[in-house]
Amino acid sequence: MQQLRVYQSLWAMERRRPDGHEWTLEQKLAMIRDAGFDGAGVRFFDRDYAREVTAFLREHGMSWQAQCYPRSVDELKPIIEHVQEFGADHINLQADVRPYTLDECIPYIEGWRRLADDAGIALHIETHRDRMTTDLFFTLQLLDRFPDLRLTADLSHYVVGREFAWPISDENHALMHRIIDSAWGFHGRVASREQIQLQLAFPQHQQWLALFMQWWEYGFRSWRRRAPADGVLTFLCELGPPEYAMTGADGYELSDRWQEAGIMKDSVRALWQGCANEEVGQEARKEAAQKKTQVAAAA
């Protein structure tokens, strides 16, 4: 049976408050566990950190994605070694390089994929500003060159990066659908055309929240068609700290991001279940129609 695993970003557990108060790592992990997340997004460039975090998650029956930011092909090698040691359901790679031409990208993509394939580890390339995938059109050209490239789709970066006009045009929907159709995981954040991260409950943001829910639903359906029967899709709630999060004049945030992460978790799980239920209903109707046809033929 296909599964959805909803993770919480450990980076998003940073508070960066004016008073300097931060949760300890132990508190963060316990909060993620107690809130019912399936796991966490874990930065894997620090071996000791990865070991500590994954030990906790494993002990509590949770899983994780290994996050990394290589600036060369070789910089992925220690990440792979850490994943081989500690495990991960996949590597999420932010390509911390900015080639000007598509041809300059090819050695990076081919090198990273070769290393991951040789190690038998799934590799997803994240869509993100100030990375190789910073521009929507450039990333679409990457997909032209590598049609089987597996993306982690953080759609917020393209909405604000290209400053999509509202309402979203059919053309822009089609471009985003093409990104989504290559997505094997999602990072969850809601943007507008001029803000990278919106508060989920504010009334003035509901049209953008609805848009992202629509795209994620499309993505779930797309993935379910492409993935194997026992496949696992990951969705990382990644509501970042300031300066991703908006703050008031006092430096404190305008909303409770931890509470919002829980809302996002529940919302995407409901979205996933709705897709699954609809597929079950369609299959039941199909079987009923076939039986009706067989009965009619026998008569």
Placement of each model-derived feature along the sequence:
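Active-site-proximal loop/turn and secondary-structure-junction residues that shape catalytic pockets
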Residues: 10-12, 46, 70-72, 95-99, ...
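Catalytic domains of carbohydrate-active enzymes, especially glycoside hydrolases
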Residues: 24-47, 82, 86-87
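Conserved, mostly hydrophobic/aromatic
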Residues: 32, 40, 83, 123, ...
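Acidic-and-aromatic substrate-binding clefts and catalytic sites of carbohydrate-active enzymes
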Residues: 17-21, 39-52, 68-77, 98-103, ...
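Active-site acidic/histidine proton-transfer and metal-coordination neighborhood
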Residues: 63-151
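Alpha-helical scaffolding segments of alpha/beta enzyme cores, especially the outer helices
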Residues: 27-31, 51-55, 59, 78-85, ...
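Conserved beta-strand positions in the central sheet of alpha/beta enzyme cores
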Residues: 41, 66, 91-92, 152, ...
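Histidine-acidic metal/acid-base catalytic patches
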Residues: 1-5, 10, 14-28, 145-150, ...
